[in-house]
Amino acid sequence: MATATLTLFLGLLALTSTILSFNADARPQPSDEDLGTIIGPHQTSFDDEIGIVIGPHATVDDEDIDMDMGTTVGPQTNLNDDDLGTIIGPEFEIHKQDFPADFIFGTSVSAYQVEGAKKGSGRGLTSWDEFTHMFPEKVQQNGDGDEGVDFYTRYKDDIKLMKELNTNGFRFSISWTRILPYGTIKKGVNEEGVKFYNDLINELLANGIQPSVTLFHWESPLALEMEYGGFLNERIVEDFREFANFCFKEFGDRVKNWATFNEPSVYSVAGYSKGKKAPGRCSKWQAPKCPTGDSSEEPYIVAHNQILAHLAAVDEFRNCKKVEGGGKIGIVLVSHWFEPKDPNSSEDVKAARRSLEYQLGWFLRPLTYGQYPAEMLEDVNIRLREFTPEESEKLRKSLDFVGLNYYGAFFSTPLAKVNSSQLNYETDLRVNWTVITNNLSLPDLQTTSMGIVIYPAGLKNILKHIKDEYMDPEIYIMENGMDEIDYGTKNITEATNDYGRKEFIKSHILIMGKSIRMDKVRLKGYYIWSLMDNFEWDKGYKVRFGLYYVDYNDNMKRYIRSSGKWLSEFLDSKETLHKCYFEGHREKGYAPKLFDVEYLEPENSQLSYRSDFM
């Protein structure tokens, strides 16, 4: 490699130092007619409330990428380990044996994204079925999760892939409507769905892989959405309690790690303020094609009801004998790390802190201290629901662990102007998240295709932040991974040569080791997103995260990528980790860049770049 090219690679992350078995015969059984189909308009007013999010996308040109994705990833540079060199400064080596003996190394998926089997399996319809079929133009290339990647029928083979990776954990979600097609027990239990999850859990355990279950990963039963508006109505709390209790009693003797919700902030903001994800609600001024919604009120109502539903599920968990003997329950929150755009600006420093409170603190403060962050109480004011004294007291005891999804960082600076007549989450936040910095010592910032700065040191920082600010909880990293755009131009060999993703994973594992050793963070596990390529929500199948490449054009065959091969060797104790592109030494100012990127400026936005995760 040319010296000039290598020099370009060695430039950024200066910031990088730092869940009573039921009698099946007694259960009400739904008929096939009850389940219905998604084809054609449903004659209910709720369907008319689903808004348009993204215009038609029929090709794979750069212009088709959603503006909020921030960047597109160009041709990947062909690099070898010899090009890496070593980190100048204090040497820090990590072996698999350096992690605690009970540490979990695993992969993550969610039901709608991978399972498929929408028809003929008894599963009821979800808000995402509605979202993708009533308005296919909202999803890249008109994609949907009808087939996913056929995990429902291939799970045994996919567990073999996990074994190939030498992982000992697998995080998945349970589809509410695969168990309760209409959302409640009295309306019918789908025994085939119950059997599927029992078989999956048993197969995992038979292969030495610990299951970790998320109860809600953005799939709201369509029947409940149509009946009373889903999470817009507090009635959802008791229905979620019933669903959670069913799962604890059915699977809790074998599943010991439970999470109630995945990324409730994204579900609230993207689904009810931006209209970008199911159920696609927002104010007209936010997106003209949103037929109904209130961006100023609904995200906070939905978030509050998710917190109350979490509390109800925890109450059931604490009283369930099936989960006694080591069972834990928590929640999975997403947060970026935020640095001030200008490190010498006190206002930018405050903006970075404010961003953490609005993204992470929005849920973690009430779940730790019983109340919302002070900044939100002051600024969102009467639009933010209050907790009763009893709720606040219970909330303080409602987490056995914190699940963290971490993908990268942003630079923060205050918004110059806010329209007080058009309030939403972003105007309440009053912070611009950008990939641009005034720090001239950081010449080449590497971003992902979804517009997030790759910043492993941010993981160390946010783990330390959670330890210091939230009573030193046990933490599991439930998602961490790197995306890439599928232009449809690569052959299998090229598509599985993911050098950048390999370095991304290596760097974050190294950072985890530092966090455990140096900061004494109580980190218990690390799950990579994702085991394999899958349906990535409104980005469809165009964005890929998998350790395994899935060939959608050839019977969904799976092929291990370079990142998966490296992980397998590391977990088999054949790799010593001490050098990574994305992890460097602050004093030496490393800023490695692996991809050519083209920035796409969002249209009509107050924000320079906004992550699709919010």
Curated annotation (Swiss-Prot):
Sugar attachment sites are 344, 419, 432, 439, 491
| Catalytic-site annotation from UniProt | 263, 479
Tell me which species this is from. Arabidopsis thaliana
Q: Which domain of life is it from?
A: Eukaryota
Q: Which GO terms describe its biological process?
A: carbohydrate metabolic process
Please name the InterPro entries in this protein's record.
Glyco_hydro_1, Glyco_hydro_1_N_CS, Glycoside_hydrolase_SF
Q: Provide an example Pfam family for this protein.
A: Glyco_hydro_1
Bridged cysteine pairs (disulfide): 282-290
User: Which family does this protein fall into?
Assistant: Belongs to the glycosyl hydrolase 1 family.
Catalyses which reaction(s): Hydrolysis of terminal, non-reducing beta-D-glucosyl residues with release of beta-D-glucose
Keywords, in A-Z order: Disulfide bond, Glycoprotein, Glycosidase, Hydrolase, Signal
Protein name from the UniProt record: Beta-glucosidase 33
User: Which molecular function term from Gene Ontology is one that the record holds?
Assistant: beta-glucosidase activity
